[in-house]
């Protein structure tokens, strides 16, 4: 038992001390000493609360230790980075943003470059000493608008930047912005989605988000011993939870996929444990949980998935999550199969989910074990093969049913790079998946804003007039 234990009915507490970094070795030692003292006292207070709570709380279903000290590791890797020309990036984004001018639908846009580059240092009292490179750069843009009925529409794209060579050209960026504007206009004129359960294809990147949201948080090991957790998969080890042609591996040691840099890559986790691949599902059967240094029944040690953002205590988190299929068809064949399913079920149409912005999933025991995902680009596909944009569609369902509805996969694996939030903060993640055909999925209407669009025309709708 230690101070990291979840108290029944309460959120996880953090025992972290922050301090400004001074110049000079002696000054740094004093600041570090003071911060350590504050953290120790906070942890002692937390342990007292845990001990008191343990006297009155009901017996835990899993009484595994709260923490097991990881083995000692010593590792140092220096990385020399080629500087990225920030003026070039600024000029690139300014020039690309001009493509938005004159568009009557756009109410707002953003063109952003972010970068985290350097080295991460890790020390613990057990003797672990680590220095590992971190290189996360990203160019992202977004354009958005709003219908008179309050419906919000958006499109965008992002590019992961790890070197000057990975910066997209102006021609590429402008072409993508123009494509996004065309999609935004199509969504503006598209009909509203209607509630329906029908066959659907989740395109590769969208399927990556689907796996991450629906399965990922439910197989994070530390959650399995939290009494307030829904435990969808806790007792499913060794059982079939999806079709036998599917496997899921989380492998944070993967730095690239098809020359695409993976944001979820790391060499050591935030508890000093070497990253390692973990087979979560093998041939449809649940095999493992993602583990940090907080053991659970049957999983006494970490498998290198303890992750956190600065100022948070690590818990088990995803890294690079990959859905692997042993039976694939071409994407064209997958669309033909979708149309056949629509006809077979007598549905007016099916769906192609091109893009997902994210969503949320309920994992607490007091709530239904459901999910809600927010597509940003959806097509209706009619029995004759005709496609039509539709807006305002949300995907809802439950994990066990949804995975059982997978019928087939394509051979078009692609990467979703993003950030994932949980109690240990926001961490970079990647998901790799092929496009997938679902026998059915439930679509419901998206909530709309109650406010009207602006009364005056947007400045974006006005042509460029120089710097006057």
Indicate residue ranges for each PLM-predicted region.
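Active-site bordering "gate/hinge" segments
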Residues: 1-268, 273, 277, 282-285, ...
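Dual-mode signal for accessory low-complexity, basic/Gly-rich regions
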Residues: 225, 236-468
């Amino acid at each position: 038992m230690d101070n990291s234990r979840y108290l029944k009915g309460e959120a996880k507490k953090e025992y972290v001390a922050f301090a400004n970094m001074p110049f000079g070795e002696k000054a740094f030692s004093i600041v570090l000493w003071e911060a350590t003292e504050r953290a120790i006292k906070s942890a002692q207070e937390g342990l007292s609360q845990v001990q008191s709570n343990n006297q009155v709380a009901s017996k835990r279903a899993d009484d595994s230790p709260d923490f097991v000290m990881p083995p000692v590791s010593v590792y140092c890797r220096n990385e020399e980075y080629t500087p990225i020309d920030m003026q070039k990036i600024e000029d690139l984004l300014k020039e690309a943003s001009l493509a938005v001018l004159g568009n009557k639908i756009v109410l707002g846009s953003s063109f952003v470059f972010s970068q985290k580059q350097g080295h991460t240092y890790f020390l613990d009292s057990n003797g672990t000493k680590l220095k590992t490179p971190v290189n996360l750069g990203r160019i992202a843009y977004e354009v958005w608008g709003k219908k008179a009925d309050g419906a919000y529409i958006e499109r965008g794209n992002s590019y992961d930047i790890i070197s000057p060579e990975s910066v997209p050209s102006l021609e590429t960026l402008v072409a993508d912005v123009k494509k996004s504007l065309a999609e935004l206009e199509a969504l503006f004129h598209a009909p509203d989605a209607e509630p329906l359960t029908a066959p659907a294809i989740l395109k590769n990147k969208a399927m990556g988000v689907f796996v991450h949201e629906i399965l990922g948080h439910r197989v994070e090991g530390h959650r399995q011993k939290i009494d307030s957790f829904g435990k969808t998969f806790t007792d499913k080890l060794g059982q079939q939870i999806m079709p036998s042609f599917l496997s899921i591996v989380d492998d944070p040691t993967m730095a690239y996929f098809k020359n695409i840099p993976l944001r979820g890559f790391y060499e050591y986790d935030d508890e000093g444990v070497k990253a390692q691949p973990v087979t979560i599902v093998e041939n449809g059967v649940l095999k493992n949980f993602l583990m940090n240094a907080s053991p659970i029944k049957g999983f006494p040690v970490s498998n290198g998935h303890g992750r956190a953002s600065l100022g948070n205590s690590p818990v088990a988190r995803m890294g690079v999550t990959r859905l692997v299929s042993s039976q694939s068809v071409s994407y064209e064949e997958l669309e033909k199969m979708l149309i056949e399913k629509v006809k077979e079920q007598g549905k007016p149409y099916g769906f192609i989910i091109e893009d997902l912005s994210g969503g949320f999933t309920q994992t607490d025991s007091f709530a239904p074990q459901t999910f809600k995902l927010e597509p940003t680009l959806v097509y209706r596909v009619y029995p004759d093969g005709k496609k039509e944009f539709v807006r305002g569609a949300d995907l809802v369902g439950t994990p066990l049913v949804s995975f059982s509805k997978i019928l087939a996969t394509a051979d078009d694996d692609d990467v979703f790079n993003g950030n994932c939030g949980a109690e240990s903060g926001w961490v970079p993640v990647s998901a790799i998946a092929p496009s997938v055909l679902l026998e059915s999925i439930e679509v419901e209407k998206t909530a709309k804003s109650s406010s009207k669009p602006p009364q005056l025309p947007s400045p974006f709708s006005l042509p460029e007039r120089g710097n006057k």
